[in-house]
């Protein structure tokens, strides 16, 4: 389980957020651009540090201002897929997926087995030796997700995970992403601006407004609050 209670002063407002996500659960964050959604992910992953607060993942404390604990990002074992994720264009699909394992000095036979399994699960085996520059947006997205999941993270953070995927392929990719998250059995937080992503991915939905949790609940509960201006416009598209 992930539990966070963090405060960080931003340029226009103070972000003050408390959230929890259970194992196997997907929490989707929505809100206006600049509301603090991606900042929440960056605070959790360790890219940014809170001014104060606590972040715990399972039995581990990742950050505690009171206890002066701040685990480096590379030691948090979090899979963070950015909106503008970057693959290595000069590498093949398999080499991209293996990159993090090589950085961890995992033995080569273990890398080969883990990469092969991840490619199978993401339907990428036939593309293992293809340079990623030749792939479609949906295929590149699957490679990026495979690269995150092969490290067996304890938490998955996805920022606009389908933004680079062709509209015609998004439905199938959304179902595939949902299946992979469920199979991993870890907490997951997704940031999106798309209603279809909410309906296809969210177990719980959270509206962030100027760095605060405005409302949280099931997708039906939150999307039913049409008196909220953002919710109304979000549903109407």
Q: Could you describe each region identified by the protein language model?
A:
Residues 150-154:
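A short, proline-enriched helix->beta-strand linker immediately N-terminal to the Walker B motif
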Residues 62-79, 103, 108-112, 222-226:
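ABC ATPase NBD coupling module
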Residues 216-217, 225:
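ABC ATPase "signature
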Residues 60-65, 102, 109-127, 178-179:
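Conserved ABC ATPase "signature" region
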Residues 131-135, 139:
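Conserved ABC ATPase signature
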Residues 156-160:
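Catalytic Walker B motif of ABC-type/P-loop ATPase nucleotide-binding domains
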């Amino acid at each position: 389980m992930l539990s966070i209670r963090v405060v960080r002063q931003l340029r226009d407002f103070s972000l003050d957020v408390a959230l929890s996500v259970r194992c196997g659960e997907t929490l989707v964050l929505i809100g206006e651009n600049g509301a603090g959604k991606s900042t929440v992910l960056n605070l959790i992953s360790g890219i940014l540090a809170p001014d104060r607060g606590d972040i715990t993942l399972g039995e581990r404390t990742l950050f505690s201002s009171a206890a002066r604990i701040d685990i480096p990002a590379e030691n948090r074992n979090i899979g963070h897929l950015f909106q503008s994720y970057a693959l290595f264009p000069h590498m093949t699909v398999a080499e991209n997926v293996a990159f993090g394992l090589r950085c961890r000095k995992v033995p080569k036979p273990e890398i080969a087995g883990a990469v092969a399994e991840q490619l199978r699960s993401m339907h990428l085996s036939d593309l293992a030796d293809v340079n990623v520059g030749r792939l479609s947006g949906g295929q590149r997205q699957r490679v990026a997700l495979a690269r995150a999941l092969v490290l067996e993270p304890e938490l998955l953070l996805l920022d606009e995970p389908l933004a680079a995927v062709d509209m015609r392929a998004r439905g199938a990719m959304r179902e595939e992403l949902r299946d992979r998250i469920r199979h991993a059995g870890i907490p997951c937080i997704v940031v999106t601006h798309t209603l279809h992503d909410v309906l296809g991915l969210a177990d719980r939905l959270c509206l962030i407004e100027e760095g605060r949790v405005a409302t949280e609940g099931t997708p039906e509960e939150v999307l039913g609050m049409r008196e909220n201006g953002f919710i109304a416009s979000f549903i109407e598209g």
